[in-house]
Amino acid sequence: MLTRRDFGLSVGALVAVPAFAQGVKVLKVANTAGVMDAQQCFVTCGQHPKLNFYKQESVDVEYVNMTSITQALQSLMTNQVHFGPMAPGILLPALAREPSLDLVAVYEWLPRNANVICVKPGSAIKSAADLAGKRIGVRNQGDPGIVVTKTMLAELGLKDDKCEYIAIGDGLPAGAAIDNDRVDAFVTFDTAAARVELVGTKLRYVPLSPKFNQVGSSWIAVPRKALKDDRKAYVGLFRAMAKSTLFAHSNLDAAFDAHWAVYPESKPKSKTEDEARKEMRFILKDRKENWMRRADDPDQRFGASSLAEWKAHIDVTAETAKLPDLAKQVDANKVFSNELIDEVNQFDKEAIIAMAKGFKVS
């Protein structure tokens, strides 16, 4: 469990018991970024006492660092966390193979596609189609990079049977693997790629396949029973998260300040504040917009999903995961739920934007 003062406990130290403090329900989140820094400000800024978005809803958040979405799935299954990010390409096969896995996607927190294809500047890879038969770097073997590659190649009528997926980690190790030609491409999230650039590795970004580029990247999944039993807490959680996301998008520097005030141990010790701020702006240069819905999205509600996008994910996953009966095994109407979304969006968005623009930590 990662509290605001202690980032040292392992997942194995957790117990599956609800946490309460002065009438506030503390909900544990699987942090698949694997690092607790201001990248999480789109959630954590609302914990600042001047904002108190979570306490106003009688909830709070604790982070549990994970190495992958696969680990987050396992932690949800064993009730070690209350909610966690989930990619359709990982969630759908799990639901098909384990019918008793009663998870539901309730909040789309990355409504744009935050996946990227990175190569060395001089690489011959110019499009997603060129990934076929190549050595693909991924953060680890449980990372969505594998599913993402399979999905794009399937869209383009290609197979990945000759691709080699190589775990290269994050940051410096990933950069070294790219620089030393251990992999031909790195398929990862926007923030992970930015961290590789920060260690000095030069990258060129290759466009995603057209259809895949139009879908969201990640949802938050919760156990269905927990959703039923603690519905009010989850509404409050996601409303506070929506407010925090809008706040961070409206004033990223203020969100950094709020995050560092709440989690002072996460502030880099080897950098000046200006250096830390500049670095974090670079990490979130693309992610900042991926938090928000596209302007042409007909549903502008924070967290909303659509039946059409989940049916599309099922169709693609059936092919990439070699599960031809997936549409029969997983009901698209049940894998996600918008039941909380109207209540989640019941807040004054202009007031949050104004609050962000005028925010001072002290």
State where each predicted segment sits.
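N-terminal export signals
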Residues: 6-22
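Extracytoplasmic "Venus flytrap"
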Residues: 26-48, 78, 141-144
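Flexible hinge/capping segments at coil-to-helix
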Residues: 120-136, 227-232
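Short, well-ordered beta-strand elements
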Residues: 23-38, 59-64, 134-137, 166
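Conserved C-terminal helix/tail region of periplasmic/extracytoplasmic solute-binding proteins
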Residues: 307-362
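Short helix-initiation/N-cap motifs at beta->coil->alpha
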Residues: 63-74, 163-176, 180, 191
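Pocket-lining segment of extracytoplasmic ligand-binding domains
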Residues: 173-273
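Secondary-structure end/capping motifs
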Residues: 230-325
